[in-house]
């Protein structure tokens, strides 16, 4: 594979101001280069060769194990390809942006602008869309949108006071789906908005009929409305039909916003702003992309959602204003100059990028997008459909494994499961008359009524096999209640126990991912490990001590 270092030799030869220029033209590579001609398997093999940590080993209670990573839904893996480029080609010329007067300032500013332009192109953004980099992931992106539309509040006390003063037609109504990560649910609940939670239908999918009814309710008429739905469950991998949801929301005058944190690394995201089935805002966590750790969160939004044009930006700081007076607004009133003390930029992307921007993080994010585009959606889909079908077939046929969610729905290969171990029970046989027989005791297999703790299974995957998975509720507690059939009474009992300090009683599961760049050997190894634990995992219980306080 050609290196980015060689390709980057053309950076300084790039024609300034060329309308078609992208970050990739700065790097001297495009999707149609010789990389694009490589075969599907060659691309994935190359990607695996660049994974940082692919040959790492670590010590476990059972000896040294090779690390096998299957926690891509939580965070992706870094790539030598990207990190080497940053170290050798960006950092030597690194300088703060907001200036063209120095070589490093000019070059860094240019790279950052090209990085943003390339990401917008990959996401189908148009002239009416704004890209804002926020914090470290989707959580910050959602919070930024809440600040922009004026519903974010610093405290619950302030929320209660202000909510009572708002007229009904002023208060936002926000519709959320059943799969939501806590970041796309709790922050809305704590905002000024009225939150309407849409549940699942009989198939465990978003109840679109219920959404239609809620949107058409007279109590929400003439009020600003917004839907904020997960594009894919980070627990089950079940995909939401975002186009259908967008159409339904738009038909009722609501904005359509989607959280692509779980599926963003693998699916095409096309804003289609202004279309009936287009998106008005997308939240994204590029750190979940392969090559993405160390990237910022992304909010791509239609400018019609921006409510701060005549006000200061959501965060004030350097690089957001055109001019600041030597006196503040109160002084200007005293001297009869009724004007604001600060002139902020009109451009949304400039005014919402206060202070030193996440320079390396933005460039790294664009490179992670490039890797995604280079591998190609057909390649990713082919590998993931194969992994999903094979994994589902083996796991569903194992009587000790229960895969959560609708296993027939369209989904990406994110699997959350419970293990109900079978145990050998010795029973005395009976004769034809129902009397105890003198024959030798028979051994029968019976299934326990309780599953192994999700975090215990995760520890066994780690300790026995070196497999990195995740135990718990995956920050999707309300959806977990649905999946595990936890009713209100049981939920309150669990809450009471947690209040007493027993966090270990919280229900959960084991989750892992079969990302497209796993090797076939790794894929089969992970499945075999699950099957081993499903058969023998309970025998290791005596070797572990459970902490009811922490859940460790």
Where do the model's predicted regions map?
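Pyridoxal 5′-phosphate
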Residues: 2-552
């Amino acid at each position: 594979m050609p290196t980015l270092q060689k390709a980057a030799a053309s950076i300084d030869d790039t024609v300034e101001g060329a309308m078609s220029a992208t970050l990739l033209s700065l790097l001297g590579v495009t999707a149609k280069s010789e990389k694009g001609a490589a075969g599907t398997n060659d691309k994935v093999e190359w990607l695996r060769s660049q994974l940082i940590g692919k040959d790492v080993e670590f010590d476990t209670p059972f000896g040294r194990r090779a690390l096998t990573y299957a926690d891509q839904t939580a965070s992706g893996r870094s790539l030598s390809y990207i990190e080497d480029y940053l170290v050798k080609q960006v950092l030597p010329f690194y300088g703060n942006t907001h200036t063209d007067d120095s070589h490093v300032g000019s070059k860094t500013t240019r790279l950052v602008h090209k990085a943003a332009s390339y990401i917008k192109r990959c996401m189908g953004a148009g002239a009416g869309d704004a890209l804002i980099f926020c914090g470290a992931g989707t959580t910050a992106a959602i919070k930024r949108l809440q600040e922009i539309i004026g519903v974010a509040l610093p405290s619950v006390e302030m929320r209660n006071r202000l909510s009572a003063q708002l007229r009904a037609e002023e208060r936002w109504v926000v519709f959320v789906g059943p799969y939501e990560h806590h970041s796309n649910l709790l922050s809305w609940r704590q905002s000024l908005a009225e939150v309407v939670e849409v549940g699942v239908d009989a198939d465990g999918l978003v109840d679109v009929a219920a959404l239609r009814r809620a949107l058409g309710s007279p109590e929400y008429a003439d009020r600003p409305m917004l839907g904020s739905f997960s594009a894919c469950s980070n627990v089950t991998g079940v995909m939401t039909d975002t186009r259908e949801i967008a159409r339904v929301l738009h038909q009722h005058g609501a904005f359509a916003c989607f959280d692509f944190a779980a599926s963003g690394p693998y699916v095409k995201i096309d804003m289609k702003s202004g279309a009936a089935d287009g998106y008005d805002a997308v939240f994204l966590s590029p750190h979940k992309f392969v090559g993405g750790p160390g990237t910022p969160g992304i909010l791509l939004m239609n400018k019609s959602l921006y409510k701060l044009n005549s006000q200061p930006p959501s965060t004030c700081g350097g690089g957001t204003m055109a001019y600041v007076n030597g006196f503040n607004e109160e002084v200007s009133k005293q001297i009869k100059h009724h004007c604001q003390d600060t002139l902020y930029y009109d451009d949304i992307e400039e005014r919402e990028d206060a202070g030193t921007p996440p320079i390396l993080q933005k460039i790294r994010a664009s490179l992670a997008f490039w890797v995604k585009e280079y591998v190609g959606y057909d390649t990713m889909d082919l590998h993931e459909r194969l992994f999903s079908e094979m994994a589902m077939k083996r796991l569903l046929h194992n009587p000790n494994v229960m895969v959560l969610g609708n296993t027939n729905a369209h989904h990406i290969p994110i699997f959350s499961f419970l293990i109900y171990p079978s145990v050998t029970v010795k029973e005395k046989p009976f004769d034809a008359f129902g009397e105890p027989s003198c024959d030798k005791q028979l051994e029968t297999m019976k299934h326990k009524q309780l599953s192994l703790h999700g975090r215990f299974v995760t520890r066994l995957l780690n300790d026995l096999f070196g497999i990195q998975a995740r135990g718990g509720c995956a920050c999707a507690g309300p959806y977990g209640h649905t999946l595990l059939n936890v009713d209100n009474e049981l939920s309150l009992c669990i809450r009471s126990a947690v209040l007493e300090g027993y966090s270990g009683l919280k229900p959960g599961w084991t989750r892992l991912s079969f990302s497209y760049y796993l090797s076939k050997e790794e894929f089969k190894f992970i499945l075999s490990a699950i099957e081993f634990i499903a058969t023998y995992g309970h025998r290791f219980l005596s070797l572990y001590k459970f902490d009811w306080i922490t859940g460790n």
